[in-house]
Amino acid sequence: MITFVDSAAKERERESDKCLDPQLWHACAGGMVQMPPVSSKVYYFPQGHAEHAQGHGPVEFPGGRVPALVLCRVAGVRFMADPDTDEVFAKIRLVPVRANEQGYAGDADDGIGAAAAAAAQEEKPASFAKTLTQSDANNGGGFSVPRYCAETIFPRLDYSADPPVQTVLAKDVHGVVWKFRHIYRGTPRRHLLTTGWSTFVNQKKLVAGDSIVFMRTENGDLCVGIRRAKKGGVGGPEFLPPPPPPPPTPAAGGNYGGFSMFLRGDDDGNKMAAAARGKVRARVRPEEVVEAANLAVSGQPFEVVYYPRASTPEFCVKAGAVRAAMRTQWFAGMRFKMAFETEDSSRISWFMGTVSAVQVADPIRWPNSPWRLLQVSWDEPDLLQNVKRVSPWLVELVSNMPAIHLAPFSPPRKKLCVPLYPELPIDGQFPTPMFHGNPLARGVGPMCYFPDGTPAGIQGARHAQFGISLSDLHLNKLQSSLSPHGLHQLDHGMQPRIAAGLIIGHPAARDDISCLLTIGSPQNNKKSDGKKAPAQLMLFGKPILTEQQISLGDAASVDVKKSSSDGNAENTVNKSNSDVSSPRSNQNGTTDNLSCGGVPLCQDNKVLDVGLETGHCKVFMQSEDVGRTLDLSVVGSYEELYRRLADMFGIEKAELMSHVFYRDAAGALKHTGDEPFSEFTKTARRLNILTDTSGDNLAR
């Protein structure tokens, strides 16, 4: 009897033996890479998959138009590594979801099940990445180990020996064990890998700019991985800017190029370079993309290969993230922030930007695709010059109203001049938009107003007097009957759709009135005893008082004194602990005193100086010249301080506790926790997070 063996099954069995530990794979891929859990729903974007194969030229899809996105369920994920370069990649097996199955579970069935939630809560293993210097990559040299890595990742070193030395065993992504000699020596003393390091450099063909990753597993084993250097400066090697300009050099202070969400400009002349030392070699072939797209359209299972270090966005995106992003009605002028990872994946930074246009990237082949839907401009264009288009689910919305930019050094009596933004008409003329803000939502344009009124931010210097009153600046309550042609409300009956069953939702309708612009006041303004509450101008979260409001504060203090003498307890000074409380009318028509951050601005019938210390301090990461502002007045304990710093810099809280130092008002250097937190908030003016707490760094 002859037995036939399934060749595909044998191949899968052989590949299963080569699969990596998921934790080591993620350590090599970078902290921002998130693979979809098994059994979760994702949207597969053939357009994004084609970008993975553009080293061979544009991908052509014969036999009709391919849909922009296909809803699929993840059947399996295999974490693997290239046998020649050690570059990690993943093979994702997808099963298209039938049309009659798409509406059953909704957003709740997007992969955040019990298994996915448990995996997300698991504590990540300790890992450390370092970009190799020229000295580290020299043949015959040694590797300078950062102190943090030596003390937290490597086995404990016996410092009583002279000199302290040990043998370190590290397993690479293929299971090969490498032996290094770890010694602590020199003047000043430092940790070094000596014997065995040159062999590792030669075998792995490491050069300066490559990154080395060390990870300690749960059972104490040490693993080592590699991240190849990206050529071409900002944007990674896969994105070379269109000729004639040469590829930019890395910006000073850190190259924000190498990470999975770093996007390139979609110019036709762009080519994908290779990571294999200058050879133009795409890891994914165009025919593989065409085959996967055809299988997806026909509803058959298919497999895709994803390289997280390829500097192209993930093309298998969590379904819930896409749906949530497309519920937003995008239009020009929206402010957003987006996370980027440094070249060695050691730090995550957020960059601010503005939506400059909302337009499909390829209207010929993908007319309804949300892929790279947003054209953006950045507040720091030098670092992000190649990032010209982004997908909506990669950004976090900060403000959905265009900012009103005021002259930063205007004279105090200069009248307010509001620029005539086409998206924000002031004079009653409402132009019909030429392009809808969301091309996927038919009938909804950038001039649509939302049932949920959102305040608009005002940027610029303080203005003591405006040509128009602040209350007049409110475009108060436009009735739906007055809205012109082309100004649509979101609570219409029909839900627009895009390809493959993706429904573009809208917020729940509340009433037929919406407020286009609100400055520093709630959306529901009510009168009390015929008096209108004055609006308040906010700058960086603090109230800016005009001369009129200051005079009102004097009058209010007199009224409060009179009402208190009459025994009316309701008219006493408001001493609430809210961050900012504006003047308001109470039941008897008197006005409560102004307060800022819980400190009354009226005392002894006189207005206090509003320029007092606000409890802010600057936070600096080691080797950074630019600090970040932290408001200590909203922090209640050292535990909350460490949590905020961990979220700000993407560092584990446990790693921060012994590395945060500060200088008080007298300039003395102290460690957080040396004094009570209440005293710390009063004296701290500068925080320093030192990854290396040696004496030289502390002296700085």
From Swiss-Prot:
Q: Which GO biological-process labels does this protein carry?
A: auxin-activated signaling pathway; regulation of DNA-templated transcription
Q: What family is this protein classified in?
A: Belongs to the ARF family.
What the record says about its domains? Answer: Interactions between auxin response factors (ARFs) and Aux/IAA proteins occur through their C-terminal dimerization domains III and IV.
**Tissue expression from the record:** Expressed in roots, culms, leaves and young panicles.
Q: How does it assemble?
A: Homodimers and heterodimers.
Please describe what this protein does. Auxin response factors (ARFs) are transcriptional factors that bind specifically to the DNA sequence 5'-TGTCTC-3' found in the auxin-responsive promoter elements (AuxREs).
Q: What residues are annotated to bind DNA?
A: 128-230
Q: Which portions of the chain have biased composition (kind: Polar residues)?
A: 565-594
- Where does the PB1 domain lie? 614-697
| Biological source species | Oryza sativa subsp. japonica
Q: Which InterPro entries does its entry note?
A: ARF_dom, ARF_plant, B3_DNA-bd, DNA-bd_pseudobarrel_sf, PB1-like
Annotated Gene Ontology cellular components are:
nucleus
Which parts of the sequence are annotated with region: Disordered? Answer: 234-254, 560-595
Q: Name one GO molecular function term.
A: DNA binding
| Biased composition range(s): Pro residues | 239-250
The record's subcellular location field reads: Nucleus
Q: What is this protein called?
A: Auxin response factor 18
Q: Which UniProt keywords apply?
A: Auxin signaling pathway, DNA-binding, Nucleus, Transcription, Transcription regulation
